[in-house]
């Protein structure tokens, strides 16, 4: 499959199942903690500066944003989890919305689960990974912000993340930086394998 990343539009921001796009294009969901670099990851893969809005304010994405890529594929930006300044009720609402999408959407081919390479995975990161494994949803685990860690320490950080998450070696693990595009090719290769 050849994808022209210049042909991009936002299809819809959906709050529930009835708003999901009705076509049968494959979908790749992107999930991670607030401020893990999800928007930067999307923008880097699509060679755009501000297609997915980056924000210094965590918790900005509150709906499922469906990005149409070349009329062939949707990236689905999932609300960032683990953000404290959102009410418990709001977090529960997001949780239900995310769970409904991940467990019922037939178009979903894989989830890019993003973690920050600098830190041990959070409780939320572990829960998301376990959830995806439980439902047999293919996972591409992406460790972001690699430019913030000396290259010589990448292996150590990778080991810490994999151990904490009880990483399944059949999943992809990609070290990524939106600053210098480390992992750009590997990320696209992993995504295209699921389409």
UniProtKB/Swiss-Prot annotation:
A Pfam short name: MMR_HSR1
List of residues binding Mg(2+): 39, 61
GO MF term list: GTP binding; metal ion binding
Cross-referenced Gene3D superfamilies: P-loop containing nucleotide triphosphate hydrolases
InterPro entries: G_ENGB_dom, GTP-bd, GTP-bd_ribosome_bio_YsxC, P-loop_NTPase
CDD domains (UniProt xref): YihA_EngB
PROSITE patterns xrefs: G_ENGB
Cofactor(s) the record lists: Mg(2+)
Segments forming domain EngB-type G: 24-195
Keyword terms of this UniProt record: Cell cycle, Cell division, GTP-binding, Magnesium, Metal-binding, Nucleotide-binding, Septation
Binding site for GTP: 32-39, 59-63, 77-80, 144-147, 176-178
Domain of life: Bacteria
Any single GO BP term: division septum assembly
Family note: Belongs to the TRAFAC class TrmE-Era-EngA-EngB-Septin-like GTPase superfamily. EngB GTPase family.
Biological role stated in the UniProt entry: Necessary for normal cell division and for the maintenance of normal septation.
The protein, known as: Probable GTP-binding protein EngB
Lineage per the UniProt record: Bacteria, Bacillati, Bacillota, Bacilli, Lactobacillales
């Amino acid at each position: 499959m050849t994808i022209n990343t210049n042909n991009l539009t936002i299809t819809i921001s959906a709050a529930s199942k009835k708003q999901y796009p009705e076509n049968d294009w494959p979908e790749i969901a992107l999930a991670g903690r607030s401020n893990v670099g999800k928007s930067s990851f999307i923008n880097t893969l699509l060679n755009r500066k501000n297609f997915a809005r980056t924000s210094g304010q965590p918790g900005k994405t509150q709906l499922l944003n469906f990005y149409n890529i070349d009329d062939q594929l949707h990236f689905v930006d999932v609300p960032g989890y683990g953000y404290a300044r959102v009410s418990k009720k709001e977090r529960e609402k997001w949780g239900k919305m995310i769970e409904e999408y991940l467990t019922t959407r037939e178009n979903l081919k894989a989830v890019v689960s993003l973690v920050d390479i600098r830190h041990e995975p959070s409780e939320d990161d572990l829960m998301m990974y376990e959830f995806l494994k439980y439902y047999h949803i293919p996972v591409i685990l992406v460790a972001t912000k690699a430019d913030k860690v000396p290259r010589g320490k990448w292996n150590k950080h990778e080991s810490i993340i994999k151990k904490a998450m009880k990483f399944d070696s059949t999943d992809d693990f990609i070290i990524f930086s939106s600053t210098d595009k480390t992992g750009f090719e590997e990320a696209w290769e992993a995504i295209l394998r699921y389409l």
